[in-house]
Amino acid sequence: MQEAAPAAESSRPEAHSCKHTNIRPQGRPPTETAMPITLEQLNSARREDAAQMLDGLYEHSPWIAEQALNERPFKSLAHLKHAMCEVLAHAGRDAQLGLIRAHPELAGKAMVSKTLTAESTNEQTKAGLTDCTPEEFAKIQQLNADYNAKFGWPFILAVRGPRGVGLNKAQIIEAFERRLHGHPDFELAECLRNIHRIVEIRLNDKFGVEPTLGHQVWDWQEKLAQHSDPDFAEKGQLTVTYLTDAHRACAQRISHWMKDCGFDEVEIDAVGNVVGRYHPAAAGQKYLLTGSHYDTVRNGGKYDGRLGIFVPMACVQQLHQQGKRLPFGIEVVAFAEEEGQRYKATFLGSGALIGDFKPEWLDQKDADGITMRAAMQHAGLCTDDIPKIQRDPAHYLGFIEVHIEQGPVLNEVNIPLGVVTSINGSVRYLCEIIGTASHAGTTPMDRRRDAACAVAELALYMEQRAAKDGDSVATIGQLQVPNGSINVVPGRCSFSLDLRAPTDAQRDALVADVMAQLHSICERRGVRYTCEETMRAAAAPSAPEWQARWERAVSALGVPLFKLPSGAGHDAMKLHEVMPQAMLFVRGENAGISHNPLESTTSDDMQLCVDAFTHVLNQLEQETR
């Protein structure tokens, strides 16, 4: 609901004095903090003095910070933030509701009567809520009333937003309207998450830190999102598909930024990948390969893929500014295509790097009849040079990729970073069940050959079967009754199957059970089925030594170590075929939604990601000396 100054998980590098990191993230104190406190002061102060230092973080609720002091000494501000999250998580629903109800409404009575706390006044002012038009004020007042009537507590939103500069009034009203339709349990949790974000920014004010590199990464993504394909751009939607004008503009912009960061070599290769190389201290040394993709799905988010380009770019920028070289090089690749939106050629960019570019792709046509070959020629790319892109794995230490989680898990557990254990193996099918179309009024229930009901029974089985594994997933994403009619028992039902699991063996066991159940259902119901396998991808378990490096980096930052599989496919899957790989996930906001305009993360979490990446670089430096 309200919020404070420029936020920063970047506090953590200052907080633990970068003892674990030789490359130091740089922050600047915000102007609002005259005398910032230090983590050393907080850790060594008498309990009552330490509590006073943290006063004002949680609205009229000092007990949260006071109880968190039991966890002293804190390794970092990230450690302190999580300790406070844990206090509230275990406080019980009544205490949580008490905290929420201690917050004033947005542009509410307390603002009008000037009885807000200093922190809330600052935050609501920065969001422009003290300068509403009569129409805006009336709209927000009505939303306040509607929200309170539905949920029984005030709407809470961190109005300083993901970068800490403030949401505008239109964004605030949109969030208000969207969340008004939420489930009460979800809304309670979302209010608490926003309170923690408010506190994060207030805490950074107190310690006089900003996530400077997190801001840099955030800004790059905002600027790159200015480029979007026609039709979508006019609607304010982000869509960048392979080799469109917007796609090529993105490549040029990334190339320009790489040069600004201090990369020694920058090129756009024969498939449109943007490649930046930062040379090692001595010639002939291996390179660390990293990166992700810059294309998007239609009407997608700003962070999917692109986060994994800009985080290592920020690290190279820092190395260059410090005049530092490592005993290995860094190669950052902004992969031109991963999503398979314009052409059916998923992982085209990373596939080319491992020699898996399929020549038949060149003859594929997009929706306008333009072949990939023609699109490449129009973009000035030389298809004859594609084989030259293939990398020799012997020249690389391995591949690491950072990525927004694209799921709700980190968001729900209030942990900013997650270490990926494996990229799930998957199988996809297009299926159809064939029964008998008959009159809906005259066909008794026990004499029907209902194709749709057979699929429905299978869907319920899949839901239960996948849940038994804990980390398998099973989805029927497409479901259609061809030529269906309101008064006809469905005679045909076409549907898709998407089955995924962290290991191939677990995936194959899931597939076997689902197929056996499909056969059993059809036998019992007197219907028949067809299934065509359309895709099979092997699981990509993280290389143990690389996963361990991410784990050490996360732990060094004072962030709880949380491990999870990746349900989505990533460029790391392709590199896994030729070299060791491991991934790091960053928490997403808005329930972790992705492939959606609501996809978001904060400067603070991105700063933590930069710091973790930096820590991995320093580990490698120690190992390769």
In which residue ranges do the predicted regions lie?
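Short, low-complexity intrinsically disordered segments enriched in A/P/G/S/L with frequent Arg
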Residues: 4-8, 15-19, 27-30
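Aromatic-anchored, charged helix-turn/loop surface patch used as a conserved interaction hotspot
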Residues: 41-44, 52, 56-58, 63-143, ...
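Acidic/His- and Gly-rich active-site-bordering loop/insert found
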Residues: 214-301
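Zn-dependent metallopeptidase/amidohydrolase metal-coordination segment
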Residues: 227-230, 291-292, 561-612
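A short beta-alpha structural unit
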Residues: 238-243, 475-484, 496-498, 502-503, ...
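Alpha-helical metal-binding/catalytic segments enriched in His/Glu/Asp
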Residues: 290-293, 299-339, 427-433, 439-465, ...
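Midchain, well-structured core segments that form catalytic/ion-binding scaffolds
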Residues: 337-338, 342-504
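His/Asp/Glu-rich mid-to-C-terminal helical/loop segments that flank catalytic regions of hydrolases
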Residues: 421, 439, 443-468, 511, ...
